[in-house]
Amino acid sequence: MKILFVIVLAAFFIGVHCKHGYPVQYSGREKGCKIACVINNASCDGECKRRGGRAGYCYFWKLACFCEYLPNNSPTWDYKTGKCRV
């Protein structure tokens, strides 16, 4: 029973150190903008995995890549502070 408790507790803490969100462009003209897509889940998944996430997909209504389980140090777009220079 104690082992099960430790496993559940460890899984909880692993989940706490991750975030979900829209990854942003690092450089160039669109620095600070969400990564655009139309229907290409494969490119979004690859981009998210390069940034340390577990999975990614093209969120169709926002026309932007969305990543799941990103590390906390990976920059993501925020509605309040998002500054897109395009």
UniProtKB/Swiss-Prot annotation:
Single GO molecular function: toxin activity
Keywords, ordered alphabetically: Disulfide bond, Ion channel impairing toxin, Neurotoxin, Secreted, Signal, Toxin, Voltage-gated sodium channel impairing toxin
Gene Ontology BP annotations: defense response
SUPFAM superfamilies membership: Scorpion toxin-like (SSF57095)
Gene3D superfamilies with a match to the protein in the record: Knottin, scorpion toxin-like
Signal peptide extent: 1-18
GO CC list: extracellular region
SS bond list: 33-84, 37-58, 44-65, 48-67
LCN-type CS-alpha/beta domain mapped to chain residues: 19-85
Organs and tissues of expression: Expressed by the venom gland.
Pfam families the record matches: Toxin_3
Location of this chain's protein in the cell: Secreted
SMART domains noted in UniProt: Knot1
Function: Binds voltage-independently at site-4 of sodium channels (Nav) and shift the voltage of activation toward more negative potentials thereby affecting sodium channel activation and promoting spontaneous and repetitive firing.
Domain comment, as recorded: Has the structural arrangement of an alpha-helix connected to antiparallel beta-sheets by disulfide bonds (CS-alpha/beta).
Family: Belongs to the long (4 C-C) scorpion toxin superfamily. Sodium channel inhibitor family. Beta subfamily.
Protein's name in the database: Neurotoxin LmNaTx17
Annotated source species: Lychas mucronatus (Chinese swimming scorpion)
